[in-house]
């Protein structure tokens, strides 16, 4: 379980107590959030909505390991993926995983529509930088990331609707993506993030030929 969540070798290091002392690491995060979640939940009710989310995240699991990602958290109808910088930038995994997930869901559109009357669509943000990685808790131990990078990634995702973009990527990450020619991108200068004093430059990213939803 720990290997799936944080990467290979983490569980053994946890047993050895290595993470009891906080470590500074560099990570890339993706925050994935279900579009129109309130409307879907109100129509389906709690039980069927939970099944809907389960089915959607089964499709996510189909693509995560193929793109060297770990699922850090599920929070309601949101999932948080994490990579080391090396694994996230290799083959542009931190970008490609989103579009593969969308393709996976598209292939199951009829299934979702027939079973639930809705098909899941997601929006996402990608950002990265230095965070603290540490073991927390005593009765229930957990490994957790802390730092402004995580908060910033969440704030970026909250702008997807405003900019009418499925995927927003920070300048920090977009500048080091190798295969930019595979994508269409739109730059947003001086993007204001709630609770932040400084603005950021963001990029709305689509596969070439895709229309902004």
Question: Which positions does each model-derived feature cover?
Answer:
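Regulatory cytosolic signal-relay segments
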Residues: 1-25
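Catalytic NTP-binding/metal-coordinating core of nucleotidyl cyclase/transferase enzymes
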Residues: 22-93
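Alpha-helix/helix-capping structural signal
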Residues: 35, 130-131, 172
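DHp/HisKA dimerization helices and adjoining segments of the cytosolic kinase module
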Residues: 49, 94-105
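Catalytic core of nucleotidyl cyclases, primarily class III adenylyl/guanylyl cyclases
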Residues: 67-93, 109-148
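Conserved, well-folded catalytic cores of nucleic-acid-processing
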Residues: 104, 108, 156-163, 180
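Catalytic/regulatory signature loops of cyclic-dinucleotide turnover enzymes
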Residues: 127, 148-172
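Intrinsically disordered, glycine/charged-rich C-terminal tails and inter-domain linkers
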Residues: 162-213
């Amino acid at each position: 379980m720990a290997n799936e969540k944080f990467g290979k070798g983490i569980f053994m290091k946890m047993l050895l107590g290595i993470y009891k002392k906080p470590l500074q690491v560099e990570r890339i995060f993706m925050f994935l959030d279900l579009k129109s979640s309130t409307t879907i939940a109100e129509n389906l009710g709690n039980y069927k909505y939970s099944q809907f989310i389960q089915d959607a995240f089964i499709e996510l699991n189909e693509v995560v390991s193929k793109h060297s990602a770990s699922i850090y958290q599920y929070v309601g109808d949101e999932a948080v993926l994490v990579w080391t910088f090396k694994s996230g930038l290799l083959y542009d995994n931190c970008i490609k995983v989103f579009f593969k997930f969308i393709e996976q869901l598209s292939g199951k559109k009829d299934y979702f529509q027939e079973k639930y009357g809705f098909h899941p669509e997601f929006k996402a943000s990608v950002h990265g930088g230095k965070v603290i990685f540490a073991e927390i808790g005593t009765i229930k131990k957990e490994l957790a990331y802390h730092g402004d990078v995580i908060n910033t990634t969440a704030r970026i995702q909250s702008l997807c609707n405003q900019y009418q973009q499925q995927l927003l990527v920070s300048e920090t990450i977009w500048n080091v993506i190798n295969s930019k020619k595979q994508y269409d991108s739109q730059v947003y200068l001086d993007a204001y993030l709630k609770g932040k004093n400084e603005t950021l430059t963001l990029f709305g990213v689509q596969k070439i030929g895709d229309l902004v939803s």
